[in-house]
C-alpha cells in the first residue's frame, strides 16, 4: 500500500493571504494565527508571504482568482467571517464565497484554504479566532501547506 501525506513545513513556499476587512476585530486574529502558523510551524519566510485586504467575504473569490492567475503563489489562504443576522444575507455571502473559492482551486489547480468563519453569533466567531475553539486562520494556513506538499507528491 502506498500512502501519500503532506508535511506542514514548506520553507520555500510563496503564499498569499487574502483577508476581509469587514469584522476586522475577528479577522485580524485569524490573520495573526495564519501568519504565526506559516512562520513557526511551516517555516515560511516572511518575505514569501503576501497579505491582501478586501472589503468583505464576498470579494474574496475575485482576489483569489486574480492571485491564482498570476501563477506566483503555491497556495492562497482566504480569511474572513460571516456572522448570521436576521436576513438571508448570510446565506448569500457565505454560499457564494465558499463556491467561488472552491471553483478557483479547481480551475487553477492551486490550494485555496478556506479560513472564512460562517457562524451564528459574534461569540462563536471569537471562539474560533483564537480562544476556546482554536484559531481557524492557523488551521487554514496549515491546510494550505499540507496541500502544497501533497500535490507536489502526486504531480507527474
From Swiss-Prot:
5-amino-6-(D-ribitylamino)uracil binds at residues 22, 57-59, 81-83, 114. The active site is at residue 89. One of its GO terms (molecular function) is 6,7-dimethyl-8-ribityllumazine synthase activity. (2S)-2-hydroxy-3-oxobutyl phosphate binds at residues 86-87, 128. It catalyses: (2S)-2-hydroxy-3-oxobutyl phosphate + 5-amino-6-(D-ribitylamino)uracil = 6,7-dimethyl-8-(1-D-ribityl)lumazine + phosphate + 2 H2O + H(+). GO terms for biological process: riboflavin biosynthetic process. GO terms for cellular component: cytosol; riboflavin synthase complex. It comes from the Bacteria. Keywords: Riboflavin biosynthesis, Transferase. Pathway: Cofactor biosynthesis; riboflavin biosynthesis; riboflavin from 2-hydroxy-3-oxobutyl phosphate and 5-amino-6-(D-ribitylamino)uracil: step 1/2. InterPro entries: LS (IPR034964), LS/RS (IPR002180), LS/RS_sf (IPR036467). It is an enzyme of class 2 (transferase). Its EC number is 2.5.1.78. Catalyzes the formation of 6,7-dimethyl-8-ribityllumazine by condensation of 5-amino-6-(D-ribitylamino)uracil with 3,4-dihydroxy-2-butanone 4-phosphate. This is the penultimate step in the biosynthesis of riboflavin. NCBIfam families: lumazine-synth (TIGR00114), PRK00061.1-4 (NF000812). Belongs to the DMRL synthase family. Forms an icosahedral capsid composed of 60 subunits, arranged as a dodecamer of pentamers. This is 6,7-dimethyl-8-ribityllumazine synthase. It comes from Photobacterium leiognathi.
Amino acid at each position: 500500500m502506498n500512502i501519500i501525506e503532506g508535511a506542514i513545513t514548506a520553507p520555500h513556499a510563496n503564499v498569499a493571504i487574502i483577508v476581509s476587512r469587514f469584522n476586522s476585530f475577528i479577522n485580524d486574529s485569524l490573520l495573526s494565527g495564519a501568519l504565526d502558523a506559516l512562520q513557526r510551524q511551516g517555516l515560511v519566510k516572511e518575505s514569501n508571504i503576501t497579505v491582501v485586504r478586501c472589503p468583505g467575504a464576498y470579494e474574496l473569490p475575485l482576489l483569489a482568482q486574480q492571485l491564482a492567475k498570476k501563477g506566483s503563489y503555491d497556495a492562497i489562504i482566504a480569511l474572513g467571517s460571516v456572522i448570521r443576522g436576521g436576513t438571508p444575507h448570510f446565506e448569500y455571502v457565505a454560499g457564494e464565497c465558499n463556491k467561488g473559492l472552491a471553483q478557483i482551486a479547481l480551475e487553477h489547480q492551486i490550494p485555496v484554504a478556506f479560513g472564512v468563519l460562517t457562524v451564528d453569533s459574534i461569540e462563536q466567531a471569537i471562539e474560533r479566532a483564537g480562544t476556546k475553539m482554536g484559531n481557524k486562520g492557523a488551521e487554514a494556513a496549515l491546510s494550505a501547506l499540507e496541500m502544497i506538499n501533497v500535490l507536489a507528491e502526486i504531480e507527474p
